[in-house]
């Protein structure tokens, strides 16, 4: 996995483990729960309780699901390094609410694809017990993230189809990353423009 393929140079993000709820993070008033990335601080916030619940889920996909959660948030860091975050923020500030939401969803699906790239890389190096199963990953996350949970995350709940895409879209883009091993295959923005998101 080489970020140079996207024209960027990798600079590490800070990983910050926190106890939920978080009163304030990334200039957003809390309470905040769950994993999220803060571009202003180049920091991935990881909720210990969330990760412990996920680790406690007894499925074959648990270890990969933990990696997927962290990889998805680090994918937002990569999006920032290569300029995608800035372009998305600019587009969202100049568009209608509906278009801004669609742009955010496209951005989140690209992060899922990048997470798929990482899962492929980790699997090839023997860092996963079993080959990643995208449906199993999302099932493990759904099992610990009830829809009724009113907790806030940035920019929205992990399972919210309005911010992160539908289950089918997430499965598709995770699989694209797993199958391709290529950052360029994760061009969700061109796919959205062609009506193929």
Describe the residue ranges of each PLM region.
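Acidic helix-start/capping segments at beta-turn-to-alpha-helix junctions
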Residues: 4-27, 93-95, 132-138
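Pan-zinc metallopeptidase signature
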Residues: 142-197
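Short pre-active-site segment immediately N-terminal to the catalytic Zn-binding motif
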Residues: 50-69, 102-105
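Catalytic zinc-binding patch centered on the HExxH motif and its immediate surroundings
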Residues: 20-47
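Solvent-exposed loop/turn segments at secondary-structure junctions
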Residues: 21-24, 50-54, 73-77, 84-88, ...
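Short helix/loop segments within enzyme catalytic domains
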Residues: 1-8, 102, 106-149
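Post-HEXXH active-site segment of zinc metalloproteases
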Residues: 80-108
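Active-site recognition of the HExxH zinc-binding catalytic motif
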Residues: 46, 64, 68-81, 111-112, ...
């Amino acid at each position: 996995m080489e970020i140079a393929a996207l024209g960027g140079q990798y600079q590490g993000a800070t990983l910050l483990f926190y106890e939920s709820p978080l009163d304030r993070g990334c200039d957003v008033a809390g309470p905040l729960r769950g994993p999220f990335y803060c571009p202003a601080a180049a920091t991935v916030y990881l909720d210990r309780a969330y990760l412990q619940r996920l680790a406690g889920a007894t499925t074959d996909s648990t270890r990969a699901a933990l990696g997927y959660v962290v990889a998805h948030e680090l994918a937002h860091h990569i999006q920032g390094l290569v300029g995608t975050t800035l372009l998305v923020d600019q587009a969202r500030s100049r568009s209608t609410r509906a278009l801004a939401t669609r742009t955010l969803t496209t951005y989140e699906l690209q992060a899922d694809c990048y997470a798929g790239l990482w899962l492929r890389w980790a699997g090839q190096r023997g860092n996963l017990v079993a080959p990643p199963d995208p449906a199993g990953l999302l099932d493990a996350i759904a099992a610990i993230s009830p829809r009724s949970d009113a907790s806030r995350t940035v920019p929205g709940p992990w399972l919210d189809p309005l911010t992160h895409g539908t289950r089918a879209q997430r499965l598709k883009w995770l699989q694209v990353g797993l199958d391709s091993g290529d950052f360029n295959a994760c061009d969700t923005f061109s796919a959205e423009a062609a009506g193929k998101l």
